């Protein structure tokens, strides 16, 4: 079954996450995703316009800092959520202790 452009774009991003520093050539992306060069070129162009990938001086493709920064945003959110939950647990524990007395 053929994948949609969105599915191919996400597959490219996932693939390039494993090659953040060195990137991959178009031909290698096509081979690994078993997609035609036409589709991959189209998808890479869209990802480039969206600032998710960029071309290296040697012609390969790498992720920009954007998707990596989004991952960092998620990690910061998780940390803040954990801190809030820890604070909430401490407050409810203290209130429960007062109720027991």
Please state what every model-predicted region is.
Residues 69-73:
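Short, charged/polar, Gly/Pro-enriched secondary-structure boundary elements
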Residues 76-101:
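Amphipathic alpha-helical dimerization/coiled-coil segments
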């Amino acid at each position: 079954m053929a994948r949609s452009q969105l599915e191919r774009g996400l597959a490219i991003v996932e693939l390039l996450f494993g090659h953040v520093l060195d990137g991959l050539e178009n031909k290698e992306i096509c081979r690994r995703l078993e997609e035609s060069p036409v589709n991959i070129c189209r998808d890479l162009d869209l990802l480039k316009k969206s600032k998710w990938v960029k071309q290296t001086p040697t012609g390969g493709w790498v992720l920009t800092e954007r998707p990596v920064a989004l991952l960092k945003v998620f990690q910061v959110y998780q940390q803040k959520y954990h801190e809030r939950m820890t604070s909430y647990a401490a407050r409810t524990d203290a209130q429960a202790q007062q109720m027991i007395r």
